[in-house]
Amino acid sequence: MSSKFAILRHGITNWNLEGKIQGRTDVPLSKAGRISLSSVSVPSLFHDVEWITSPLQRARETAKILDLKKTRTDIRLIEMNWGEWEGKKLKDLREQHGVSMRENENRGLDMQPPG
């Protein structure tokens, strides 16, 4: 028995365009994100599979625009909590915190944003 597995990233949000960290902030897709997704089609191999999305609006909107039929949300797929850094630009945080920011980023999934 074989399993099918695919990962799709949500469409573009205004915060993506502005370079802001989204984290768990429930930012919707931008107009550009909705338009770009409207020209995307999921390969037929994946038409009849179950799709699981983050509960965040941008992920649910993406699934709806792509016309994914069998969808459900799962809280375990929600974005990392970026705490006080949500809504801020990563480039600004790097300038502001210098070496300590780079060290924190180098921790990968163990990175600890404040708040």
Spans of features found by a protein language model:
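Active-site-proximal alpha-helix that buttresses catalytic centers in soluble enzyme cores
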Residues: 8-69, 96
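Phosphate-handling substructures
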Residues: 66-115
